[in-house]
Amino acid sequence: MKSFRNHKRIALFTALLILGFSTTVFAHSRDKDRWDNKYDTEVYLFGENPIPFLVKNVHLLPKGKVLDLAMGEGRNGVYLATQGFDVIGLDISATGLKKSHKLAERNNVTIETQVVDLESFTLAPNTYDVILCTYYMQRDLFKQFQSALKPGGMIVVETYNIDYLKYARFSRKWALDTNELLDIFKGMRVIRYQDYDNGKEAYSSIIAQKP
């Protein structure tokens, strides 16, 4: 009887593991399909121009290898490529990355890309001169940035903060708390930081350097 109960427990535990894995795979597949559908248009969903914070501060960044996380259609990564950086972009959407290459061609530069599910991705240590991540919120990924940078490397992060909830229907978990970027990257030297609110949208931006 005891052996039978143990077998039942093992079977139940295995079933739960399989169910959890299947649910996770389904969720990630659904994210991929959702973004592929969004990007499946001739128009660039977020435009072709880089974010102003990046343009204003590009002269501060060390030249070298850039990792553009959640690259999307490539507006920021392609801009950095035009400024002489070696850019590799990661995103869950193959459709978005295909548009990134088209944008790069129009700007007479080349980029590398890879379709990756960032929710299960681990950054290699001491690899990048710059890590760029805009309008993608994954706190556990942010915590890998410092170790993934080469000494003296920099991160550029910009995304919506809690004040954005005043202007749009937006999940609270995807919005930064007050000073959250400063807290996450407190082990790094802050080069630039801003909180922006124009009455229509609100976001926070940071450039920080690994010692």
Cite the ranges covered by each PLM segment.
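A short, conserved alpha-helix within the catalytic core of class I
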Residues: 137-149
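Core SAM-dependent methyltransferase catalytic element
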Residues: 196-211
